[in-house]
Amino acid sequence: MIRFILDTSIFVNPDVRKKFGNTPTEAMKTFLKYAEKLFGKVEFYMPPGIYKEVKNFLEDIPPEMELYIIKKPPNVHDIKIPAFVVYELIEDIRRRVDKGLRVAEKAVRESVIDTNNVDKIIQKLRRNYRKALREGIVDSTEDFELILLAKEIDGIIVSADVGILTWAEKMGIKWVDAFKFKELLDELVEKVESEKERK
């Protein structure tokens, strides 16, 4: 049985979502049609935090969500995480803090030189600081739950979030780039339907 663990980016990230629909609701409805065709062959999971987050973006909640998307929290008490992952996380955080400080120092220097554009400099500081500290890292408990659940059930993460995919790779977890997910579902549906025809 193939098990996919779904991230919000499939339904919320406009670049990914457009393959399924123009709005999060359309994207979910299209996805659920795939889930229906693959029912019994493929399972789709979401940790409760991600499920709740996705529901917040939907105009109406299709009842099929309850049928085709399994809500499961990871068993956080029994999952073992290799020590090297914690070491890497600490080193990564240290590098990011240093990088964030350099971004802040640069903004201060610019504001001293150009006192007329302090608001623009602060906006730029916030954007660059956020990028320095958050890009490429698991930055929420929901993201971490996604990774832990995939590890627990030996599932395949589907996400466009660079931080999630980076840490999934470091932990030896299978993943699919959300940008290619619809094509993968098309292939799976085709395979399932051809198997039915042969029987």
From Swiss-Prot:
Protein name: RNA-free ribonuclease P
Catalytic reaction annotation: Endonucleolytic cleavage of RNA, removing 5'-extranucleotides from tRNA precursor
Pfam family membership, one: PIN_5
Primary role: RNA-free RNase P that catalyzes the removal of the 5'-leader sequence from pre-tRNA to produce the mature 5'-terminus.
Enzyme class, UniProt record, top EC level: hydrolase
Entry keyword annotation includes NADP: no
Molecular function GO terms recorded: ribonuclease P activity
Record-linked HAMAP family: RNA_free_RNase_P
Keywords per UniProt: Endonuclease, Hydrolase, Nuclease, tRNA processing
InterPro entries reported in the protein's UniProt record: PIN-like_dom_sf, RNA_free_RNase_P
Similarity comment: family membership: Belongs to the HARP family.
GO biological process, one term: tRNA 5'-leader removal
EC number: 3.1.26.5
